[in-house]
Design a protein with these regions (language model features):
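Short alpha-helix carrying the canonical HExxH Zn2+-binding catalytic motif
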Residues: 425-438
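Contiguous, non-catalytic segments that form substrate-binding/exosite surfaces or channel walls
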Residues: 91, 99-212, 219-417, 424
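Long, well-structured alpha-helical subdomains associated
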Residues: 23, 52, 58, 80, ...
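N-terminal-proximal low-complexity accessory segments that begin disordered
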Residues: 2-72
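An active-site-proximal "capping" alpha-helix that borders the catalytic cofactor pocket
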Residues: 31, 249, 459-476
């Protein structure tokens, strides 16, 4: 395969998904030591694959196992409509790491019947008894999870109309556990914190699942070696230990050692240690994410989804982000927010443009284009943050979208299309830089305000805050002075694209009649609809049908400034009520007529609204017993890769939570009290 044609190349398309390839430019030129660091970090990324499947739903590993067994062993009538539908369902399960849509959160509707599935399973059980060792009761339960529309309809519920925990099927909480009980549990932990924990608060609940005893007492099943997901964490840790031999810096080695201690013990203090060392290590060329990181999938915003990612710094492109970081204090001082909420001295803000080398967990197959970590506000305030803009993912998306007809279909004004053609690629990446590097790194909480005060609305608030910061500064003359934009018109491309996406084009991803659910989509809708409301009042923005017109871009910047000021206030003061009201007003409901027209126009283009990626296959080349190279293969197909990952990186039992209960059964409070009484009687009789 000609590697020059790899970026953005289509691998397969199914349902509402198109799978692409990305290219690791410059990998061949790396020294062997650095290639081996990438290799071992990548292996640790693959080893966590089963974790994200189980976190996304308690039946996912069993469903994946059954479907993969059928896919690889059922050899009769594979051309029928029902088998093709079953194949597509499996493809969707692979992509979403579960049976719910990776963006919309709704459960997939199978286009094959339960009778068809059960017939195949029964046949395979007769012919290959050891392949599918499930009882009739177990299979009935699994079939109900797949086919019953009233059961687990949504992975993450964010509507606020019901108990968010009970209404969500993500596997962070036992069935029957309610939102108020969880909030009380973690509030008690915060109230009982000692002085050290108050000074350096752990991210309560990040690496655990909430279970309950027979009498309803809550307790944590901690993700650690010897605990829940222990088998996977042992294997992840083994590859991290292998990586220690090839680290870029001594600080990177120390960070990995803290991460290993965290996986070994489950102690969140070790995770804080890891984050502090990781964020201070800015000299690395090869860096990584590995852990229970983002909390978007948890309706309460506490539980981290397992994620792995490896990337290589692009030193030339990073000159752009270096300029931004050096000016962090200037940007903070000039931000249009209340001075009380500004950082007095922004610390440790670093940013790079990177080439992703491997994706895993919550970042695979769908992946972000930019990342800013760590998430703990106190670490960001005291030690800073690291941001990355992922250039080869940007490039793959750009290549895949060339001449796809979207702009011609949704932008009537030829001058606007020309504006976007000229500046879009540049402003898109710069907006990501500003969002990740400065947006997430800006502002501070008022004294005594909990970082969890905004609850289920925290993720939308945080993404809106970062986007607004980037949008506001995109039009600033300071970017021209820094040489980051070519002229004073470039920012208009960013503004137009952002509003068009938030008001119109992102709706192609949502089924007619549904609400906006995903945090990033809600954020974009909130900002764009607020701006449109202001623009209508002042005659600066119009939306006639699907035709967007912006007549005063300077006024639009003012709207962004006003909204940023309020969004920052909500976070800094922990104003849950105001945040909820704003999100529910601007970011959830969709006008049905507009939505129908968007979908009709989009359908004519025959495009897939969601995209993701297969990874390059990375293998060691030996001469004798010596490793002489790490080679990349860009030819692996989608199903081929998914089946290989299941063969080579299956680390967990089919029902990890059940296995954990058998390993660590928790008695009820009543049982403990009886045991206490018996011990007292025994001591008394011995006396």
């Amino acid at each position: 395969m000609n590697k020059l044609n790899i970026a953005g190349q289509s691998v397969i398309r199914f349902a509402d998904i198109e799978v692409l390839r990305y290219q690791i430019d410059g990998f061949e030129a790396l020294p062997l030591k650095r290639k081996l660091l990438v290799y071992h970090l990548s292996q640790s990324t693959f080893a966590g694959r089963d974790i994200i499947f189980d976190q996304n739903g308690r039946y996912n590993l069993r469903i994946r196992h059954i479907l993969e067994t059928i896919y690889t062993h059922y050899e009769v009538a594979r051309e029928t409509d029902e088998f093709v539908a079953l194949e597509e369902y499996l493809y969707r399960v692979w992509f979403a790491s579960g049976i719910h849509h990776h963006y919309g959160c709704d459960k997939f509707v199978p286009n094959f019947s339960q009778a068809y599935l059960s017939g195949i399973v029964e046949g395979l059980q007769r012919e290959h008894a050891l392949l599918l060792e499930y009882s009739e009761d177990e299979l009935a339960d699994i079939y109900a999870e797949i086919f019953d529309p009233t059961r687990s309809p949504k992975s993450t519920e964010q509507s606020g109309e019901a108990d968010l925990v009970e209404a969500s099927s993500v596997n962070f909480y036992d069935r029957g556990v309610g939102q108020k009980a969880v909030e009380a549990y973690y509030q008690a932990l915060q109230d009982e914190a000692d002085e050290d924990e108050r000074q350096a608060p752990p991210s309560y609940g990040l690496n655990s699942r909430i279970a309950q005893t027979a009498d309803g007492t809550l307790y944590e099943q901690v993700y650690k070696q010897g605990g829940l997901y222990g088998e996977a964490l042992y294997r992840i840790s083994a590859h991290l230990k292998d990586a220690l031999e090839y680290v870029d810096t001594e600080m990177q080695a120390e960070a990995i050692k803290s991460l290993l201690a965290y996986y070994r013990t489950g102690n969140l203090k070790h995770y804080n240690d890891f984050c502090i060392k990781w964020v201070q290590d800015t000299a690395v060329s090869v860096d990584f994410i590995n852990g229970f990181t983002e909390v978007y999938a948890d309706p309460l915003g506490l539980k981290g989804s397992w994620e792995g990612l490896v990337h290589i710094k692009n030193p030339i492109a990073s000159e752009r982000t270096d300029k931004i970081c050096r000016e962090a204090k200037w940007f903070e001082e000039h931000a249009p927010i209340d001075d009380r909420f500004k950082k007095a001295e922004p610390k440790g803000i670093s940013a790079s443009v990177v080439t992703v080398a491997m994706l895993g967990g919550d970042s695979y197959p769908a992946t972000p284009i930019g990342i800013n970590l760590p998430n703990a506000d106190w670490i960001r305030a005291e030690y800073g943050s690291k941001s990355v803009t992922i250039d080869n993912i940007h490039a793959a998306y750009r290549e895949a979208s060339r001449h796809n007809g979207m702009d011609a279909a949704f932008i009537a004004d030829a001058e606007v299309r020309a504006l976007l053609e000229r500046y879009d690629g540049l402003t898109d990446e710069l907006h990501t830089d500003l969002h990740e590097c400065l947006g997430h790194g800006s502002g501070q909480l008022s004294p005594g305000v909990s970082p969890d005060a905004l609850g289920a609305y925290a993720s939308v608030n945080e993404e809106a805050r970062a986007d607004l910061f980037a949008l506001y500064y995109m039009a600033d003359e300071h970017l021209l002075e820094l040489g980051l934009l070519p002229d004073a018109d470039a920012y208009k491309a960013c503004y137009y694209r952002y509003l068009l996406n938030g008001l119109v084009t992102q709706l192609v991803r949502i089924p007619l009649g549904a609400n906006i659910e995903e945090a990033h989509m809600r954020n974009r809708a909130l900002i764009a609809r607020y701006a449109l409301e202001r623009g209508k009042q002042e005659g600066t923005i119009e939306l006639n049908g699907l035709d967007l017109k912006i007549t005063n871009y300077e006024a639009l910047r003012g709207y962004f400034a006003d909204l940023l000021r309020e969004v920052q206030r909500m976070k800094s003061e922990g104003d849950f009520a105001a945040c909820k009201q704003m999100v529910e007003r601007y970011a959830v409901q969709i006008d049905a007529d507009l939505h129908e027209e968007v979908l009709k126009r989009y359908k004519s283009l025959n495009l897939a609204p969601y995209k993701g990626f297969v990874n390059p296959k990375m293998t060691l080349r030996y001469e004798g017993e010596a490793i002489v190279d790490v080679e990349l293969d860009y030819t692996e197909a989608y199903a081929e890769q998914m089946l290989r990952y299941s063969r080579e990186y299956w680390t967990l039992p089919l029902n990890p939570v059940q296995e954990e209960r058998l390993r660590d059964p928790r008695p009820s409070a009543k049982t403990l009290e009886k045991a206490k009484e018996l011990r007292a009687k025994l001591r008394h009789s011995m006396d």
